[in-house]
C-alpha cells in the first residue's frame, strides 16, 4: 500500500508563477521514501499540467478535491488543529 501525500498547488507548489523554492528536493525525498504525491487545486487542471511540464516536474496526478486517506495534507491556508481554544486564538 502506497502512502499518499496531498499537496495544494497555489502557494505551495507554485509561488508567484514559479516553482516554490525547495519543491523539487521535497518531491524527490517523498518519492525516495515511497510516498505517492497528489496535487489538489481549484485551478484548471490543464493549466496545472502545463505548468508542471514547463518546469520539468515529474509525472504527478492532479485533482480538484483533497484525496481521502492521505497521511499528510500540505496547504498554505491550513490551520493545524490542536484544540478549539488554540484555533479561535487566531481569529
Where are these regions (language model features)?
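HAD-like aspartate-dependent phosphatase fold
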Residues: 1-91
Amino acid at each position: 500500500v502506497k502512502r499518499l501525500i496531498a499537496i495544494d498547488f497555489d502557494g505551495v507548489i507554485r509561488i508567484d508563477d514559479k516553482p516554490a523554492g525547495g519543491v523539487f528536493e521535497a518531491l524527490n525525498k517523498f518519492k525516495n521514501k515511497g510516498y505517492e504525491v497528489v496535487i489538489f487545486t481549484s485551478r484548471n487542471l490543464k493549466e496545472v499540467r502545463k505548468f508542471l511540464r514547463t518546469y520539468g516536474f515529474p509525472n504527478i496526478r492532479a485533482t480538484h478535491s483533497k484525496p481521502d486517506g492521505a497521511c499528510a495534507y500540505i496547504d498554505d491556508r491550513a490551520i493545524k488543529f490542536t484544540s478549539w481554544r488554540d484555533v479561535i486564538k487566531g481569529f
